[in-house]
């Protein structure tokens, strides 16, 4: 065997090992992604069932164990009875009814704890065994830090509903939801950067537009968080007009005017609707751009799927509105928003190609 042949075999062996390592890390990130989706969906159910304030303390370690006997349940229920939500809305609630809302919030917090372990433990293993190359180590540390911050934001949100309000602040709810979606975006973006793509990266203009679409979807999710926090989906339950008007007359009844954008349920729903149309227009324009510059490519075909997903999400949103936000449609609307976000992220990453090395 010549030296050149031995060198080629050695390079092939290293390449095969690197491919295996990238695949392992990618599958791990996919698992994290799935659990993050589950957390957001359980969080949505927690919000829609009015369960988010059922646990009035933040116990990152001791909170893992729920009440185990009747006395402990009564103690937990007594804590809930001290807050305004019980006193003003749920007064007279039975212990059984309290238990049903308790389990939603407990499950949400348990999933959040679980994903912390799902990130930290494999991260340590991959780091020690040298499976994380280049900047991947620091990207993953950033995700871990962002996850810790999200836990603090979650308690900050819950705390807003324990003293004076009967529900959590819509500002904090929207921030909590959007931060979760930013983490989902980052995890999926990194995972898709470890894929081997058959097509070369798209031109910079396409990459930038794809990135702006991801940003627009995140903004729309933030606006959806405001809608959820204010129960703004119950204001105008007609479409395409809003109670017979294109632009209702009571959008700016609060002073100063900008407060309406965050605190007036009618204005918040109006903005969420209008921005939904904006996202749809952006995806159509992006598709036209890609088909003009690189027609018939995988990049172009993906944009057709993206437009289709946005259209489906719009239909789900309209149905949710017309039916006054029933639980199943509200959760479907939230889930499909995550599908749109994930596909937009996958498309954006694919236009840039895989990470080098």
From Swiss-Prot:
Coiled coil: none
Topology within the bilayer: Multi-pass membrane protein
Domain of life the protein comes from: Bacteria
GO CC annotations on file: plasma membrane
Function of the protein: Catalyzes the conversion of heme O to heme A by two successive hydroxylations of the methyl group at C8. The first hydroxylation forms heme I, the second hydroxylation results in an unstable dihydroxymethyl group, which spontaneously dehydrates, resulting in the formyl group of heme A.
Principal location: membrane
Keyword Transcription: no
GO BP terms: heme A biosynthetic process
E.C. numbers: 1.17.99.9
Pathway: Porphyrin-containing compound metabolism; heme A biosynthesis; heme A from heme O: step 1/1
Listed name of the protein: Heme A synthase
EC primary class: oxidoreductase
Pfam families (alphabetical): COX15-CtaA (PF02628)
Binding-site residues for heme, renumbered to this chain: 272, 333
Cellular localization per UniProt: Cell membrane
Signal peptide: none
InterPro entries per UniProt: COX15/CtaA_fam, HemeA_Synthase_type2
Needed co-factor(s): heme b
UniProt keyword Secreted present: no
Family: Belongs to the COX15/CtaA family. Type 2 subfamily.
Transmembrane parts of this sequence: 24-44, 110-130, 140-160, 175-195, 209-229, 274-294, 303-323, 325-345
Subunit field text: Interacts with CtaB.
The organism of origin for this protein: Brucella anthropi (strain ATCC 49188 / DSM 6882 / CCUG 24695 / JCM 21032 / LMG 3331 / NBRC 15819 / NCTC 12168 / Alc 37) (Ochrobactrum anthropi)
A GO molecular function held by the record: metal ion binding
Keywords per UniProt: Cell membrane, Heme biosynthesis, Iron, Membrane, Metal-binding, Oxidoreductase, Transmembrane, Transmembrane helix
Reactions listed under catalytic activity: Fe(II)-heme o + 2 A + H2O = Fe(II)-heme a + 2 AH2
């Amino acid at each position: 065997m010549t030296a050149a042949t031995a060198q080629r075999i050695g390079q092939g062996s290293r390449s095969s090992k690197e491919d295996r390592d990238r695949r392992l890390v990618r599958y791990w990130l996919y698992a994290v992604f799935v659990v993050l989706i589950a957390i957001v969906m359980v969080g949505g159910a927690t919000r829609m069932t009015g369960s988010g304030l059922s646990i009035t303390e933040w116990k990152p370690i001791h909170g893992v164990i729920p009440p185990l006997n009747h006395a402990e349940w009564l103690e937990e229920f007594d804590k809930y009875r001290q807050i305004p939500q019980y006193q003003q809305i749920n007064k007279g609630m039975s212990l059984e009814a309290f238990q049903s809302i308790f389990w939603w919030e407990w499950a949400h917090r348990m999933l959040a704890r679980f994903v912390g372990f799902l990130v930290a433990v494999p991260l340590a293993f991959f780091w020690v065994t040298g499976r994380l190359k280049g900047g991947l180590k620091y990207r993953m540390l950033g995700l871990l830090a962002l996850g810790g911050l999200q836990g603090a934001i979650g308690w900050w949100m819950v705390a807003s509903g324990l003293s004076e309000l009967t529900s959590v602040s819509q500002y904090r709810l929207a921030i909590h939801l959007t931060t979760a979606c930013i983490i989902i975006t980052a995890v999926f973006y990194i995972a898709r950067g470890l894929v081997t793509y058959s097509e070369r990266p798209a031109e910079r203009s396409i990459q930038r537009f794809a990135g702006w679409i991801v940003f627009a979807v995140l903004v729309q999710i933030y606006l959806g968080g405001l809608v959820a926090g204010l129960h703004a989906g119950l204001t105008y339950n007609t479409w395409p007009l809003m109670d017979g008007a294109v632009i209702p007359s009571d959008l700016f009844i609060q002073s100063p005017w900008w407060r309406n954008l965050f605190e007036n349920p009618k204005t918040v729903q109006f903005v969420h609707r209008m921005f939904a149309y904006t996202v749809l227009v952006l995806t159509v324009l992006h598709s036209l751009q890609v088909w003009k510059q690189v027609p018939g490519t995988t990049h172009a075909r993906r944009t057709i799927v993206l437009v289709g997903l946005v259209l489906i999400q719009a239909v789900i949103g309209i149905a949710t509105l017309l039916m006054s936000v029933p639980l199943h449609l509200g959760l479907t609307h939230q889930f499909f928003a995550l599908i749109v976000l994930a596909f937009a992220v996958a498309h954006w990453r694919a236009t840039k190609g895989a990470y080098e090395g």
